[in-house]
């Protein structure tokens, strides 16, 4: 018996589709863009089967378009995700994700002795890759952290 199974997630007319998000990261992306407070319809797929990743997360946000700056922030969480802008059910633009050089006022410095915890200054990190791993260096305490440690906060 040959059984063919197909996962179907409803298409959106206009908006953004973020695909190939690593499993367990989709909720963090929702919070990063404050989508969980949006009045627009958001379709969330968690732990979906993926031939490339094993499992993946997927987000479809109707009537919301992610800009280049937001795509750079997304790259910190999901550097290999794909971002498609949809208009009238068609992909009209694909955003390439690139790590930003700097990221400000997005994450809290994990170093509890950092000045950002006691003074009214925005956090600021330099972003770089080392041996394929994304690292963030705090502008103030100059400590270097892995992406996973910083984005968990």
Curated annotation (Swiss-Prot):
GO molecular function: metal ion binding
Gene3D superfamilies, sorted: Aspartate carbamoyltransferase regulatory subunit, C-terminal domain, Aspartate carbamoyltransferase regulatory subunit, N-terminal domain
Stored InterPro entries: Asp_carbamoyltransf_reg_N, Asp_carbamoylTrfase_reg, Asp_carbamoyltrfase_reg_C, Asp_carbatrfase_reg_C_sf, Asp_carbatrfase_reg_N_sf
Cofactor dependency: Zn(2+)
Annotated binding of Zn(2+), by residue: 109, 114, 138, 141
A Gene Ontology BP annotation from the UniProt entry: 'de novo' pyrimidine nucleobase biosynthetic process
Alphabetically ordered keywords of this record: Metal-binding, Pyrimidine biosynthesis, Zinc
SUPFAM superfamilies: Aspartate carbamoyltransferase, Regulatory-chain, C-terminal domain, Aspartate carbamoyltransferase, Regulatory-chain, N-terminal domain
Cofactor, free-text remark: Binds 1 zinc ion per subunit.
GO cellular component, one term: aspartate carbamoyltransferase complex
Pfam families with a match to the protein in the record: PyrI, PyrI_C
Subunit structure: Contains catalytic and regulatory chains.
Entry function: Involved in allosteric regulation of aspartate carbamoyltransferase.
Stated family: Belongs to the PyrI family.
NCBIfam families named among the record's database cross-references: ATCase_reg (TIGR00240)
Full protein name: Aspartate carbamoyltransferase regulatory chain
